[in-house]
């Protein structure tokens, strides 16, 4: 296990998406283990580019007028997951605690259940 974390986000025109990406990276103890999978539904007047600070990312960009809803976007972003050790579904407007990645992995191991779900 290499502790790769797939962060799944479905975002519909959320102006805080880039903030969340920056925050999740800045507060991670091991940002090099982060992989982003995002369905970014952007408005015509919005910048569709995102900055991942050189980290691995898989992004599906959809003009907002072509969106078919939240579940549809989640389904698209789920398909971006490959062989990462952890899959975490997050919102596009979140703040993270310092070393959040290390803390959640520790919590997972404390369960002693390889199929544990943390919420």
Residues covered by each model-derived region:
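Catalytic cores of eukaryotic secretory-pathway lumenal/extracellular enzymes that build
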Residues: 2-119
């Amino acid at each position: 296990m290499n502790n790769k974390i797939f962060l799944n986000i479905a975002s519909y025109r959320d102006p805080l998406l880039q903030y969340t990406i920056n925050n999740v990276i800045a507060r991670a103890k091991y940002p090099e283990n982060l992989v982003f999978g995002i369905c970014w539904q952007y408005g015509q007047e919005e910048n569709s580019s995102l900055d991942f600070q050189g980290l691995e990312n898989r992004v599906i960009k959809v003009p907002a007028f072509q969106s078919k809803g939240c579940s549809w976007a989640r389904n698209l972003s789920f398909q971006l997951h490959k062989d990462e050790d952890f899959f975490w579904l997050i919102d596009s407007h979140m703040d993270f605690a310092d070393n959040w990645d290390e803390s959640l992995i520790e919590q997972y191991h404390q369960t002693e259940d390889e199929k544990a779900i943390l919420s």
